[in-house]
Swiss-Prot record:
Source species of the chain: Dictyostelium discoideum
Superkingdom: Eukaryota
Protein name: HssA/B-like protein 42
GO biological process terms on file: sorocarp development
Classification via InterPro entries: HssA/B-like_chaperone, HssA/B-related
Family: Belongs to the hssA/B family.
Region Disordered: start-end pairs: 1-29
């Protein structure tokens, strides 16, 4: 059984030319060969700086599952820290939970 939830928020930058999308995702895997991954940052940025923020939390309950952190969006920072079991910060736009 795999439980995945994500909360996204969008805000307009001060310059009004770009928007910043930040997302937080949490995944809990309760079976072998399951994948729990975090959220994915969006494109655009704060004050036009092109910063994508992503926060991810992966919790491995079995020891045999894979947990992945989050990654930044387009032109953003890919700082992904996985939970228990290791992490992979390059899941944005990849096969990690379809995000």
């Amino acid at each position: 059984m795999t439980l995945f939830s994500s909360i996204s928020s969008m805000s307009t930058s001060m310059s009004g030319s770009k928007s910043s999308i930040s997302s937080f995702g949490s995944g809990t895997s309760m079976g072998s060969n399951s994948i729990a991954c975090g959220g994915c940052g969006g494109s655009g940025g704060i004050l036009g700086s092109g910063l994508g923020l992503g926060l991810g939390l992966g919790l491995d309950l079995t020891g045999g599952s894979r947990s992945r952190g989050a990654c930044g969006g387009n032109r953003g920072n890919g700082n992904g820290n996985g939970g228990m079991g290791g992490g992979n910060g390059s899941c944005c736009g990849g096969p990690c939970c379809g995000i």
